[in-house]
Amino acid sequence: VGERSDIVEEKRLLRARIRAWRAGLDAGTVARAADAVAAQGLDFLQVRGSAVVSGFASLPDEFRVWPLLRRLHREGHRLALPVMQGKARPLLFRAWAPGDALDRGVWGIGEPKADKAIVEPDILLVPLLAFDRRGWRLGYGGGFYDRTLQRLRALQPIVAVGLAFDE
């Protein structure tokens, strides 16, 4: 039990340090990172045909995913954004396209309107606080994406792509 609380505390401190670092990033750095990822697109996945790709409504200090989503929309992919269903529950996904209005959900995060179709993504873009060289990710600690990936992978193969800033 003591080790577990040490790990929890270590993660809490790491999250605070990374959030402070991200808050210090200048607008130019943030924009260049978003443009670089949008220029790459999802070419590295060698996706054939139209996939359902779920992005996320970026929080102020998160990676800006909008340029990538606009590119994917132009390429013919169907887009979705997550919707919070409540604490300790997996995310739900509703169809979204650039220009669609968003409602403010939990924590002020933009979510598609309730009349948008529920969809199951093939590719999930995941916001990360951090990652390491082995690909292990550090999220915000709520477990939403862990639960969501577990649910989706029980239904079908799904690809998750983490997006974060690199120091």
Question: What do the PLM-derived regions correspond to, one by one?
Answer:
Residues 2-122:
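N-terminal active-site beta-alpha-beta segment that forms phosphate/nucleotide-binding
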Residues 89-167:
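Conserved phosphate- and dinucleotide-binding cores of soluble alpha/beta proteins
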